Each structure stands twice: as structure tokens, then as C-alpha cells.
Amino acid sequence: MSRGTMPQPGAWPGASCAETPAREAGAAARDGGKVTAGAQPRAATRCPAEHEEDMYRAADEIEKEKELLIHERGISEPRLSVAPEMDIMDYCKKEWRGNTQKATCMKKGYEEVSQKFTSIRRVRGDNYCALRATLFQAMSQLAELPPWLQDLELILLPEKLINKYTWIKQWKLGLKFDGKSEDLVEKIKESLALLRKKWVSLAAMKTAEARQTACDELFTNEEEEYSLYEAVKFLMLNRAIELYDDKEKGKEVPFFSVLLFARDTSNDPEQLLRNHLNQVGHTGGLEQVEMFLLAYAVRHSIRVYRLSKYNTEEFITVYPTDPPKDWPMVTLIAEDDRHYNIPVRVCEETSV
């Protein structure tokens, strides 16, 4: 898709590929030559066309891994959602040591990215990965506060929408809020208020170093971090409702929204919530077409180096394809279409 094409429905993760558990620790390595630490079982996507590794796991596996990590490093050490930066080619050599066709493709992809960026930050690969990588990049950039966050109506949005669309009460709160009998409207209002508060604080910082340090700290606070994801998911639902209503009224809408509501599992916003957004963070991540919706929700264009698509027109994919000129851009790296890492430190000799 690179700079002008859309991913076809058959290429979306989840459109035609069944997710099955990889019951042997070495399954991922056999699949493409990638070295995985700790021999932890993962859920793997087995697509007939590409057989790409799925970095996502079930919620209970994620919690077990967290307990193990806490036990190993001690409870006092903060959990890292976004790892410290390291040289991008050192990371590639560490992760892709094999000589399989996939490993070779990944190495060439990383070599290409290294012409633009010198370092990488690994993002924790749970079912919030796409949200985490995008939001971390957007909030850590030295830029002004986005205008949409300054809208006084933002915090009133949950009450307004839930009063109009009672089916939103089907909303499934994230992992950190399971089992809590909090009022849904109040919980989402709190999440949106937190998103605004943290972004305002970061935008007021004068140096990139100060902003980066504060953002790193924010993404080690699990309760606040997961609350931010609830806010972003609600913003995604709000944009989906707006786009669906415009489409029903015959107004011109972005092409991705036509595809979004053409799926059997998301013919309307209610189905999108029940079958897709409610699963994000629990049993699934964002599909390709939902990356467009994420971009529209936070009003940032998302440029992704899709390493598995090296040497094709889809190697660099931008969501949306033709973003408004005033939208900031975040850049991510994807080894597959589910897990995203963050490239950092632009090479001085490039303008990208």
C-alpha cells in the first residue's frame, strides 16, 4: 500500500487467518528464524500466504508472564511497556539469527530502516501493542497540544453518546478494570480527563529530553497507562459512529470506513464495538483497517515500516493514505501486522 494503495480484505489479520496456540516454545523460531527469549508460548497466526508469527497471546498468558517477570526482577522495579533504545542493527542481529527466507527478509528490512533511524525501542507485545506504540510516539513528540484535546466537549462525550446509543453499555473495560463495579460513563470520563491532563503536561515541557523522560514514567504506571487505552478506544468508537452516520446520510467518507463496515463482523458501530473494540486488550489487537480508525481517532498519521513486505509497495504504509496536512506523524516498525516497535533517532544525513 505504501503511498497510494489500501490493504485488501484478504490481507487483514483476522479476515481469513485462524489464530491457534503455539504449544511448543520453539514454534516461532521454526517458523521464521526469530530468536525468542524465555521460551514462552505464544499465540501464532497461521496464514496460508505468509505464515507470519503473531506476537499476541491470551489475557491469562499475559498475566502469567507479568507475574513471572515481577518475581524475577523484584516487585520494586517498574514494568517497562516501552524498552530503552538500542542500536537498530544490534537489535536485528539479536532477534533474527537464522538464514530462513523470512529472517533474510527481516534483516533487509531493518537495513533499509537503519538508513533513516539509528535506534529502536521495543514495545511490549500484548494486545494493546498498536495503541501503546502509537500513543507513546504521539505523546512523546515535542509538539503543541492537539486542538481536539482542547475541546471542552471532550469530557462530556461519554455521557452524550451513551445516552443516545444505549448499546454502548456493552463496553468491556480493559484488563486492569475487570471485575470493578465502576460506573461506565464516569470511568470513561476519567480516562479522557487523564489523557488530556497528561498530554497537556507533556506539551508544556520545553525540551525533548524532559518530555521523553516524563512519557517513559507514564508508561510504567499500569493503572494510568491502561486508562489511556480506554480513552483512545472510546475516541475510536466515536469516530466510527461519525463515519457510519455520514455514510448512511450519503456523505463522502474515507474509503477505509467503507471497508470497515463491509466486514460481516462490523456492519455497524455496535458490531464493531462488540466484536472488535471490546476484544482489544483482551483477546486481540487492532486489525489493519482499524489502524486507519486509530489514526482518525488521535488525528495523527501513522507511518509503518512493514518489514515482512520488504521490497514491495507495501513496505511503507501510511494510515491514512492521504492525511490532512496539519496532522502530526508517528513512525512505527512492524515485524508482522500485529506487533509494533518504535524507531528513534533520525539519521542526520536524511530528511525523513
From Swiss-Prot:
Record localization: Cytoplasm
Keywords: Acetylation, Angiogenesis, Coiled coil, Cytoplasm, Hydrolase, Immunity, Innate immunity, Phosphoprotein, Protease, Thiol protease, Ubl conjugation, Ubl conjugation pathway, Wnt signaling pathway
Disulfide bond positions: none
Region Disordered, residue ranges: 1-49
Its EC number(s): 3.4.19.12
InterPro entries per UniProt: FAM105, Otulin, Peptidase_C65_otubain_sub1, Peptidase_C65_otubain_sub2
Motif (PIM motif): 52-57
GO cellular component, one term: cytoplasm
Matches recorded under CDD domains: OTU_OTUL
Reaction equations catalysed: Thiol-dependent hydrolysis of ester, thioester, amide, peptide and isopeptide bonds formed by the C-terminal Gly of ubiquitin (a 76-residue protein attached to proteins as an intracellular targeting signal)
Highest taxon of source: Eukaryota
Pfam families assigned: Peptidase_C101
UniProt domain comment: The specificity for linear polyubiquitin is given by the 'Glu-16' residue in ubiquitin chain.
Similarity-based family: Belongs to the peptidase C65 family. Otulin subfamily.
Protein name, per record: Ubiquitin thioesterase otulin
